[in-house]
Amino acid sequence: MITWSSLSVNEKKQALARPAMANSQQLKQTVGDIIARVEKEGDEAVLDYTRKFDCPDLTSLVLSQENIDALAAKVTPEVASAIDTAFNNIKMFHEAQMPSDIALTTTPGVKCELRFTALDAVGLYIPGGSAPLPSTVLMLGVPALVAGCENKLLCTPPNKEQLIAPEIAYAARKCGIDKIFLCGGAQAIAAMALGTDSVPQVDKIFGPGNSFVTEAKQQVSQRADGAAIDMPAGPSEVLVLADEFANPEFVAADLLSQAEHGPDSQAILVSNSATLIEESKAAVERQLATLSRAEIARPAMENARYILADSIEQAIEASNAYAAEHLIVQIENARDYLPKIKYAGSIFLGPWSPESAGDYASGTNHVLPTYGYAKNYSSLGLLDFMRRYTIQELSADGMRNLGPAIMALAAAEGLDAHEQAVALRMQALKQGDA
C-alpha cells in the first residue's frame, strides 16, 4: 500500500508510472520493411505474411459474402440477441452525436459556414488472438454506419480454416461492413493504408492491436500517401476510486476485469480507506483463483498499485495525475465529484457501473485513449468518422466592409500578393461605384 501524502512530487510520478512501451529501433525497422514489401508486392506480400503467421493454406484475402452469411448464421440466439442489444445502444448514443452545420454572418456581407461530411473510406482492424472481439467490431462499425461512411472494410486474421469467428461475421454484417479481408498485423495496416489489388485504400484506419500494429499505424499516418489513424495506443488500464462505502468484491472484480486483458494491463486502486484497500486485495486473491484467464491476470495484478489517500479530494488528485483510460468511481454520491474529475477516457459512475458495461453494451465507445493520452485525446466518437470544412462567401458589400482590415493585416505580415488580391477587388468596386 502506498500512502500518497507521504510521497514527494517525483515519488508520486513514479507511483503512477506506466511501463515503457515497445519503441525499439528493431521494431521500427521490421514494421518499415513489412510496409515497404506490401507497397511493392501488394497482395502477394500480404498473403505470404498471413500464411506465415496465421493460416498456412490461405488462398485468398477476401472472405466471400457466402462465407460471411454462413458464419453469421452459426451465432447462437443468445449471443445474437446480446450483439443486437449492444448494437442498438451504441447506435442510439452515436446518433445523438450527429453535429449540425453552422451558417452565420460575421460582418455585413460576409457569410461563414461550417459543414460536416462522412469520411468516404474507413478501414477497421479487429485483432485475432484467443477470443473473438465482436464488441470491437460494433465500436468501430456502428459509428462508421451512423456517420454515413460509404466504404467500410474490415481486416482480421483468419483461423487455420481460412475463416473468422462467427460472432465477428455477425457483428460486421449488422454494421453494414462492405468487405472483410483475411489478414492481420502490420501487413493488414499497410494494405489498408496503401491499397492492393484486393484491399482498397482507405482514408482512415481504426482499431487496436499489438506493438506491430501500433507501430504500423504510426508509420502510415506519417506518409503523405498513407492514411490517418484514430489515436495512439498503449496497454489497457483502469483506475478505481473508492471510499469506505464501496463494496470490496465489486472493486476486486473491476480490477481483475482489466487485468485479464493482458499481463501488461494496468490496475490501480486509490482510496481514502485502508480497510477498503486491504479487503479489496483479499477479494482479488479469492476471485483470481476462479478465473479461466488467471495466468494472464496474475502478472498484471502483481504489478497493481494500491494507493491510500487522506481524502477523496486527494484521491481525485492522484486520478487526475494518472489520466486513466477507464475510471471507475465507487464513492458515495459519486456524481457530486464529477466536476473535480479532469482527465479520463471514460468514467463509470457508482457501484452499478462496471467497466464491462462500457466495454460491451451501455452505448458509449470502448475505444479510449490510454497511456496518459486522456489528458489531450478523447474517446472515439462519431466525429472521428467525419471531417469538417468551412465556407466563406463575401458579397460586394462584404468586401467593402472587410477589405481594409484584410489589407492592413496582409501588409503587416509583408504578404504583398495577399494585399493585392483584395486591393484589386476594392479598386474594381470603386470604379463600379463611380
Regions found by a protein language model. Name each.
Residues 104-170:
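Conserved small-residue-rich beta-alpha loop and adjacent elements
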Residues 320-434:
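C-terminal core of ALDH-fold dehydrogenases
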Residues 1-7, 179-184, 306-311:
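Short acidic-hydrophobic, aromatic-tinged amphipathic segments that line or gate anion-handling sites
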Residues 99-104, 265-270, 290-300, 328-331, ...:
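Flexible, glycine/charged-enriched surface loops at secondary-structure junctions
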Residues 176-250, 254-266:
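Conserved NAD(P)+-binding/catalytic subdomain of aldehyde/semialdehyde dehydrogenases
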Residues 1-120:
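N-terminal Rossmann-like NAD(P)+-binding subdomain of aldehyde/semialdehyde dehydrogenases
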Residues 257, 261, 269-344:
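A glycine- and small/hydrophobic-rich beta-loop-beta segment
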